[in-house]
Regions:
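Contiguous, often N-terminal, cationic amphipathic patches that form binding interfaces
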Residues: 1-48, 53-58, 62-68, 72-93
Length: 93
């Protein structure tokens, strides 16, 4: 399913005490990262956390808009929307 791509709206809280997938706020995924919101550190942390959580390489997860905003649009390549939601629900509980 390499050609499959999902766009995922995300709200990020940078500078948190720990990095985690915090849950859903409507259709928007809430993510907390310990990295600060400076020089792309929080964006890189978001991409790495999502890639690890979804079992993808870091190249499979990219922020496509909102790089300087807490609200971002993330592209996930290689998984269907159902697979993304299932894997996220496993860590959110």
């Amino acid at each position: 399913m390499h050609g499959v791509s999902v766009r995922l709206p995300v709200k990020v809280v940078a500078g948190s005490s720990r990095s985690c997938i915090a849950g859903w706020l409507g259709d928007t995924l809430r993510i907390r990262v310990s990295a600060p919101a400076e020089r792309g550190k929080a964006n890189a942390a978001v991409e790495a956390l999502l890639a690890e959580t979804l079992g993808l390489s870091t190249g499979g997860v990219k922020i496509v808009s909102g790089t300087s905003s807490p609200r971002k649009l993330v592209s996930v390549v290689g998984l269907s929307e159902a697979e993304v939601r299932r894997k996220l629900s496993e860590v959110i509980g």
